[in-house]
Design a protein with these regions (language model features):
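C-terminal substrate-recognition "lid" of short-chain dehydrogenase/reductases
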Residues: 136, 140, 148, 228-262
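Active-site helix of classical SDR
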Residues: 136, 172, 180
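Short, small/polar-rich loop/turn modules that mediate ligand/substrate recognition or access, typified
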Residues: 188, 193, 250-252
Length: 264
């Protein structure tokens, strides 16, 4: 096969998302908000989804003002199939067909396994694993019919390692990683890529308990080869890459943004 080097695009243009429409669950705070902002900065119109309408609308207004893109807020419980169907209809009215789906809504309930309730388990699994499945099931086939799509699931370093006191969370994130791989295989031939971002420790609301405990915070730092927690902006580049044409040959992969933790 002869290589046509003259056909290569400007590499920076590959990262532009002009004309694309993205939906980010849990986009009102934490890593989801950072990802939503990055996609908008790259030219995408964005739908911010959370359970609380006031939260997602406030975030949407802030991001629209700072990025000069169309950003809307839509309330939905993405762990409920009826809400996901309603969400799909609503975002199509507001923005059009979704090209980029980011499943970043997350929940963590910490505690020893024998101390956790069944409802604790169900809540974490529903938010972290069931919701990406439901959203993928609705939006993925629509992307396939149009021949282009990007799905990014938020995994974790706990997709591949374990820590005490995190049975529901680690189980859900391990599931997310294999869900990502299965969907990638099912839709690879139809122009839709499915990948996971697996972050290490970041300063988000989910980690307030650790951030407020100096000993626990430093214990995590000691496990990270770069010697610090992640900063929120450091997730943005990973998301933009996987959402763009630059990653058209990347699917079924997990991108670890963890300061080297899982390299050990």
């Amino acid at each position: 096969m002869e290589t046509d080097y003259g056909s290569r695009k400007n590499v920076l243009a590959l990262f532009r998302l002009d004309g694309r429409r993205a939906l980010v669950t849990g986009g009102n705070r934490g890593l989801g908000r950072v990802i939503a902002e990055a996609l908008a900065q790259a030219g995408a119109d964005v739908a911010i989804v959370s359970r609380t309408l006031s939260d997602c609308r406030a975030t949407a207004e802030e991001l629209a003002a700072s990025t000069n893109r169309r950003v809307v807020g839509i309330a939905a419980d993405v762990s409920q199939s009826s809400d996901v169907e309603r969400l799909a209809a609503a975002v199509e009215i507001e923005l059009g067909q979704v090209d980029i789906l980011v499943n970043s809504a997350g929940l963590n309930v910490r505690g020893a396994a024998e101390e956790l309730s069944e409802s604790d388990w169900d809540a974490v699994i529903s938010t972290n694993l069931k919701a990406p499945f439901l959203c993928g099931r609705v939006f993925g086939p629509r992307m396939c019919r149009r021949g282009w799509g990007r799905i990014i699931n938020l995994g974790s370093i706990l997709s591949v390692i374990a820590l005490p006191g995190r049975a529901p969370y680690a189980s859900s994130k391990a599931g997310v990683l294999n869900l990502t791989r299965v969907l990638a295989l099912e839709w690879a031939a139809k122009g839709v890529t499915v990948n996971a971002i697996c972050p290490g420790p970041f300063a988000t609301d989910m980690n307030k308990q650790l951030l407020n405990d100096p000993a626990a915070y430093q214990a995590f730092v000691a496990k990270i080869p770069v010697g610090r927690w992640g900063e929120l902006h450091e997730i943005a580049g990973a998301a933009l890459f996987l959402a763009s044409d630059a990653a058209s040959y990347v699917t079924g992969s997990a991108l670890f943004v963890d300061g080297g933790w899982t390299a050990q």
